[in-house]
Amino acid sequence: MKKALVFLADGCEMCEALCVVDVLRRAGINVFTAGVTGERVVSSHNVEIKADVMLSEVKNEEWDLVFAPGGMPGATNLASSSIVNSIILDTYNKGNIVSAICASPAVVFGPLGIIKSGKATCYPGCEDYAPGIEFVSDGVIVDGNVVTAKSAGWAFDLGLKLISLLEG
């Protein structure tokens, strides 16, 4: 069974996170939500959720997919976590799927050097967080093992794309 990790940090966009979690779980993917800023996470719109695990509990596991939802300051909270960055880079370097939506492609993935210009999308206005990278306006983009999506309106399509990539 494929295994996915979804990062949850205070200030994240919960509809992006939970839409992807729901779609992946319906497809039989073993999904873990991991609290980065605490076991209970409060979204950018004050929705509170309890993560399945704390990030520190699963930091040494191997993942078929890791996913960073957007939202502010959720994306900056993810980007400031050395454990999040390490898991993303480890997953990417193993050739497994790394995915981000909304602000996170620019804020989280941009500084890690895993996005190529013209081969990623992000929420309009977040491009400045990743100087030197040209983002495109498409809804969902796959570039090798990096999958990015533009905004909450694309979360369902992103989830379906991730299933097709994981399950072939």
Name every feature range the model reports, one short phrase each.
Residues 45-53:
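Short gly/ser/thr-rich secondary-structure transition/capping motifs
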Residues 19-21:
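Histidine-anchored nucleotide/phosphate-binding helix
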Residues 3-12, 26-36, 52-168:
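Active-site-adjacent pocket-lining segments in enzyme domains
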Residues 34, 39-45:
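Membrane-interfacial amphipathic helices and adjacent loop/beta segments
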